[in-house]
Amino acid sequence: MAAVHLYIISFTALMISSTSEMGGYPKCSVNIEVDLIVGADMVVLIVLTQFQRVITQLPNKCQLIFNASYLPFLFTRTIKISKVERQQGERSKMAMKSKIELKLIHKGSHFYIQLPI
């Protein structure tokens, strides 16, 4: 792993169900601390304890929206438990709306989110 940086990003969880549209559902917004570890072939976001307390209270079907505009190359990401939709930011070189796999790993008091770059 090449570098470690600490960021505060905004986290929004939208409660959704399989039969309804997302509009009008209650939102849960918290600020979370994230360690960004940049490796050769992936980015690992180590999400600290306040995110764990939120996500354990969410239903199985929910949409997690990260506003990561302060990260150098992780801009807006829409995370749907097993998928990540990449959206192009001002300085981002990512393809618009390309799909990648997301791993959400729970270890102790941390959640590890592994994103291939």
Curated annotation (Swiss-Prot):
Presence of keyword Signal: yes
Superkingdom: Eukaryota
Stretch forming the signal peptide: 1-20
Keywords tagged on the record: Signal
Additional facts recorded: Partially overlaps MTW1.
UniProt-recorded name of the protein: Putative uncharacterized protein YAL034C-B
